[in-house]
Regions:
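Short, small-residue-biased leader/transition segments that mark boundaries at the very start
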Residues: 2-3
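Short hydrophobic targeting helices and cationic amphipathic motifs
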Residues: 7-9
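Non-heme di-metal
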Residues: 21-201
C-alpha cells in the first residue's frame, strides 16, 4: 500500500490552488458545492464542539476528546473549501474585517429582524425576543469590526497621536508612548503582540 507524505499532499494542494481552475469557478455548480461543503463542515465543527462538552459533562472524557479532534478536522476541511472559494488564499485582514462587518450588518438589519417578525406572527414571542436581542449583539459586532477596519486602514493599530499604554499580550509588559515597540524588551515578542492596555474593570 502506497502511503503519501503530508508534504506530497501539501504540494498537490498548492498546485490545485494555484491552477487556472480557480479562475473558472465563478457561477459553476462546483462553486455552489464548495459553498455548501464549507457551510456543512463549519456547522459540523460547531455541533461536535457542543457534543464534546456534553460528553465530558456526562462523564465520557475520551468521547469528548474524540468529538474535539473531529471538530478540528472539520475546521481544516472547511478551510480547504474556504480558500478554494477565495482564489486559493486567505484574504487580508482589512478584507476580512469588511466582510465580517457586512455579514454582521446583514444579520442584524435583515436576517434576525425578519426572523423576529415571523416568530412573532407564529406565536413564538420568546423566540422573537431572542432574535431581537441577538440582533442587537450583531449590531455591536458590526460597529467593532468597522472601528477595527478604520484602525487598520488609518495605521492606528500600533500607533496613536497621543501617548498610550501599550501592553504586551504575551508577558504583560507595559510601554507608554505614541507607538508600540517593534519588539517587547522583556519577552522579545514582536510588535504584533502589543495592544492598548484596557482598564475596563
Amino acid at each position: 500500500m502506497l502511503v503519501r507524505s503530508d508534504l506530497d499532499l501539501k504540494l498537490d494542494n498548492t498546485e490545485i490552488l494555484n491552477s487556472k481552475i480557480m479562475k473558472e469557478l465563478k457561477g459553476t455548480k462546483t462553486e455552489a458545492n464548495l459553498q455548501t461543503a464549507f457551510a456543512g463542515e463549519s456547522m459540523a465543527r460547531n455541533k461536535y464542539t457542543y457534543y464534546a462538552s456534553k460528553a465530558k459533562k456526562d462523564g465520557y472524557v475520551q468521547i469528548g476528546k474524540l468529538f474535539e479532534e473531529t471538530a478540528n478536522n472539520e475546521k481544516e476541511h472547511a478551510k480547504i473549501w474556504f480558500k478554494l472559494l477565495h482564489g486559493g488564499e486567505m484574504p487580508d485582514t482589512a478584507t476580512n474585517l469588511l466582510d465580517a462587518a457586512e455579514g454582521e450588518n446583514y444579520e442584524w438589519t435583515d436576517m434576525y429582524a425578519g426572523f423576529a417578525v415571523e416568530a412573532r406572527e407564529e406565536g413564538f414571542e420568546e423566540i422573537a425576543i431572542l432574535f431581537e436581542k441577538v440582533a442587537a449583539i450583531e449590531k455591536m459586532h458590526e460597529e467593532r469590526y468597522r472601528k477595527l477596519l478604520a484602525n487598520v486602514e488609518g495605521g492606528l493599530v500600533f500607533s496613536r497621536d497621543e501617548d498610550m499604554m501599550w501592553e504586551c499580550s504575551n508577558c504583560g509588559h507595559v510601554v507608554i508612548g505614541k507607538k508600540a515597540p517593534e519588539i517587547c524588551p522583556v519577552c522579545k515578542h514582536a510588535k504584533s503582540y502589543f495592544m492598548i492596555h484596557a482598564t475596563n474593570f
